[in-house]
Amino acid sequence: IVLNYEEGAENCVLNGDKNSEIFLSEIIGAKPVKGRHMSMESLYEYGSRAGFWRLHKLFQKKKIPITVFGVGMALEKNPEICKAIKDAGYEVASHGWRWIDYQNIKKSEEKKHMKLAIQTHKKIFGERPNGWYTGRCSSNTRDLVMEDGGFLYDSDSYSDDLPYWEIRGKKKQLIIPYTLDNNDMRFATNQGFNTGDHFFT
């Protein structure tokens, strides 16, 4: 089970962005706002204020080991959540520095963000992350992961049901594909699930 922790690193003018977030919220078809979008900010805040804690308590009660895909900026802003993650012994893979779309970000900027994410992870958890998942990656992301060379696995792929090796010259990278079919985000998208029964069938 993977718990994505992104709240606090999304597009928001408070983070220096030009527009509000539009991705993965309960506001279907949200349009970017050039300024503060109080409803969107509040929806994202739910994850750090209530969502994480509800799931964390459930996982602890049922003794379920999980992996947290943690966005560096979001983790840095929420030390109480980081403490809970450490105390629980969850694996934490890096989910990048920001929860933004890297499609049109320069490779040099994306590389800088990757370094920031790794440094922040080391500062918080005392070691570098073993896994990487940007989520909204670019055509450069896999190159940067392999150039870094320190990740046991990369999950920026949806291309298989099983892990596989990507080989480029003398370098190889374990790919553990991500899945959107087994993701609760499908409850928040218009092509997604309508009921819990749809999810389980």
Locations of regions flagged by a protein language model:
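Catalytic alpha-helical scaffold of carbohydrate-active enzymes acting on polysaccharides/glycoconjugates
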Residues: 1-176, 180-181, 199-201
